[in-house]
């Protein structure tokens, strides 16, 4: 098979799995296909803020296309060129989390932790930092800007993104990209943001991270 034929088949696979009709919101258990790169050094990431989409590419070949939740107007996701670093599969927020005592668990900021309380940061699994204090991580993917500037990825997809992106991988964040009109058009979007929040006792536990671990191969077989 020629390289061009492989590229066309790969696009078709993404189209069948990642595209839907006019209703772009996924009903049920959300996931996104991912493919192992031939050369990890050629992997790059594009983030379209207008399309709330992440494109992981090996040169021009799509490896992963998925929805993301971006920063609010008052706390926007930074634009520009970056590189991935500080990958942490079990990251907790240094700013927002919970004040824990024997009497209860109360949401709060780290810098406002009352005396006698223990601060436990909100879980941000599969953290990939691209600028100090900003990163990709697992979380609810709302259909509107909702974060403090980070880029949230559905919990089923975040392990794949984490595996594809290495320290030093180039990341471009822009208002839009040409891919928005091709591989990113009518992208499937999760509805996990409608789910009730897990119990606070669960969020402060290691079990939260344990339950998000994906077993087995994360990647699809390349089309033959």
Regions found by a protein language model. Name each.
Residues 1-9:
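Bacterial N-terminal signal peptides that target proteins for export
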Residues 40-42, 49-52, 63-65, 79-81, ...:
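Extracytoplasmic
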Residues 30-44, 49-50, 64-72, 80-82, ...:
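N-terminal post-signal-peptidase region of extra-cytosolic proteins
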Residues 50-52, 59-62, 71-73, 87-90, ...:
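Solvent-exposed coil/turn segments that connect beta secondary-structure elements
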Residues 10-18:
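Bacterial N-terminal signal peptides
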Residues 98-224:
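Exported/periplasmic cell-wall-interacting domains
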Residues 76-100, 161-163:
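Short, surface-exposed secondary-structure junctions/capping segments
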